């Protein structure tokens, strides 16, 4: 059809022929009834020739898409309401689907069905998707009966399988060898089969946390032949001991929130690449660990044993350890010899234990030359631990029983940046005027919740934060705050200060508070 909407070429020619015929004599003869056979034949031949378009030179773009042009690919098939951003991707997430969608192309490589209400996956529909690499079924209502084991035999290219937050009670009996990531977290799984995760040479990450797995539900050969696994999460289950036969390739092992009371001898003897081990919130006792438990973990950097029943620091700690979390146990005394081997330790967390007056012997922490942060809050310590590492930057020990601060108690920690002695038993008479003199880099000092009746003398001029709320302060004079021109936050709430107890010009000393309008507290109680 012409682009201007005019008549077709053949129609135009027919009109011209008709007009020409009217100008010739033979139409007159026709009208008189004298047209012979020869004239009839000539007219018909002429009409046939003129109705056929002669070859012409087209001025149109040959690539212009015309109706019915077969050069354009047909539209891709995509399930109703889903999106198909690429030829190999089908995204049906969050559509409240109750049945497996129809019309999924066999060419699909990535299929997303998470956040729906699917209860089952039909075998005939799943098995035909043999090229599938990613199958995401996260957050549905799929039961073990609704997940056909046979279908996975056809999915020989599957690499990423996500079925977390469903209703599975057992893991699939078989998953393809091509698998790289398997996420079965937050189901009700009580049993894993030998070929669920075994014989998967490419498998790197397995997530089984928040299930109901006990040791009987994990066969000894669960991970046999899968020696590329680097991340294994078994947290929040019902395990009573470490599973045997863990892959030697592990780098992260999550076992927190179980019922583990014992780590069998040799259970961690092959995991020389393990960097992070999470065992918090279990039932570990001293007898459940021995000197060899952690001794072979030559790459271990992070060890969390908090919220257990330990009475001592574990033996055989690796030298590579950087973070040791022992909070909320029953530790009464720190064995210096056991800590000495972990010379690279940077963060030691001992909060909420039972450390008393002799809980930290003098020099017990001194070999930890790289120690950066020490958490001791919630114990029964009566003094600041003597002879601490020189590189210590943060000493956190609120809620203890410290009643005095001598002139040299903090002498070994000149590099402190944060000191928290809140909610102890400090009284002004027992805080030496030179107690803070050497702390020239201190930025945060928390003395809240003590029994101070006046500001301590000799506060470091480097301070940015000073917390003194919930004390017995009765006076505030300019000279007490002299030199604190970097102070940005001053908390004085819940003391015994009255308006007349604050000397003239007191706030003028605190230029940073005024210039930056920092949130200092002038509450006068």
Task: Name every feature range the model reports, one short phrase each.
Residues 89, 110, 134-136, 157-160, ...:
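Conserved LRR concave beta-strand detector
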Residues 2-89, 93-94, 107, 117, ...:
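Terminal targeting and flexible regions in eukaryotic proteins, enriched
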Residues 98, 119, 143-145, 169, ...:
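Leucine-rich repeat
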Residues 127-212, 219, 231:
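A generic tandem-repeat structural signature
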Residues 80, 84-86, 94, 144, ...:
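Disulfide-rich extracellular modules and peptides
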Residues 289, 355, 474, 488-525:
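Leucine-rich repeat domain C-terminal region
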Residues 124-128, 148-154, 172-178, 194-200, ...:
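A structural signal for leucine-rich repeat
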């Amino acid at each position: 059809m012409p682009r201007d909407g005019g008549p077709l070429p053949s129609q135009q020619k027919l009109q011209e022929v008709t007009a020409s015929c009217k100008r010739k004599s033979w139409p007159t003869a026709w009208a008189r009834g004298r047209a012979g056979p020869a004239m009839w034949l000539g007219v018909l031949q002429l009409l046939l020739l003129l109705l056929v378009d002669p070859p012409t030179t087209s001025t149109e773009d040959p690539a212009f898409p015309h109706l019915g042009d077969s050069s354009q690919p047909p539209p891709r098939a995509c399930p109703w309401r889903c999106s198909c951003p690429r030829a190999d991707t089908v995204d049906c997430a969050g559509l409240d689907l109750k049945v497996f969608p129809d019309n999924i192309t066999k060419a699909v490589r990535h299929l997303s069905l998470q956040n729906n209400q699917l209860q089952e996956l039909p075998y005939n529909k799943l098995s035909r998707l043999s090229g599938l690499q990613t199958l995401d079924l996260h957050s549905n209502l799929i039961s073990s009966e609704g997940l056909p084991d046979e279908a996975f035999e056809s999915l020989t290219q599957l690499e990423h399988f996500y079925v977390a937050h469903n209703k599975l009670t057992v893991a699939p009996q078989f998953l393809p060898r091509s698998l790289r990531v398997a996420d079965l977290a937050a189901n009700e799984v009580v049993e894993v089969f030998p070929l669920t995760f075994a014989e998967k040479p490419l498998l790197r990450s397995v997530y089984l946390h928040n299930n109901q797995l006990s040791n009987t539900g994990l066969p000894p050969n669960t991970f046999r032949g899968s020696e590329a696994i680097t991340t294994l999460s078994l947290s929040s289950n019902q395990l009573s001991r470490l599973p045997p036969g863990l892959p030697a390739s592990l780098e992260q092992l999550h076992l927190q929130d179980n019922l583990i009371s014992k780590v069998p001898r040799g259970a961690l003897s092959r995991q020389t690449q393990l960097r992070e081990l999470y065992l918090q919130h279990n039932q570990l006792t001293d007898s459940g660990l021995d000197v060899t438990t952690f001794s072979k973990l030559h790459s271990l950097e992070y060890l969390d044993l908090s919220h257990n029943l330990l009475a001592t620091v574990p033996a055989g700690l690796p030298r590579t350890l950087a973070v040791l979390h022992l909070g909320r146990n029953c530790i009464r005394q720190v064995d210096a010899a056991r800590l000495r081997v972990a010379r690279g330790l940077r963060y030691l967390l001992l909060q909420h234990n039972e450390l008393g007056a002799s809980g930290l012997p003098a020099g017990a922490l001194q070999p930890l030359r790289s120690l950066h942060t020490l958490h001791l809050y919630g114990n029964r310590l009566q003094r600041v631990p003597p002879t601490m590492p020189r590189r210590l930057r943060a000493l956190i020990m609120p809620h203890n029983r410290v009643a005095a601060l001598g002139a040299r108690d903090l002498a070994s920690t000149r590099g402190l940046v944060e000191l928290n002695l809140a909610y102890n038993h400090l009284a002004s008479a027992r805080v030496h005027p030179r107690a803070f003199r050497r702390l020239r880099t201190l930025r945060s000092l928390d003395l809240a919740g003590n029994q101070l009746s006046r500001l301590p003398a000799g506060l470091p001029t480097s301070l940015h934060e000073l917390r003194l709320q919930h004390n017995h302060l009765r006076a505030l004079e300019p000279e007490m705050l002299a030199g604190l021109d970097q102070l940005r936050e001053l908390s004085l709430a819940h003391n015994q200060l009255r308006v007349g107890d604050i000397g003239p010009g007191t706030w003028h000393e605190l230029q940073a508070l005024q210039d930056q309008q920092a949130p200092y507290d002038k509450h006068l109680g």
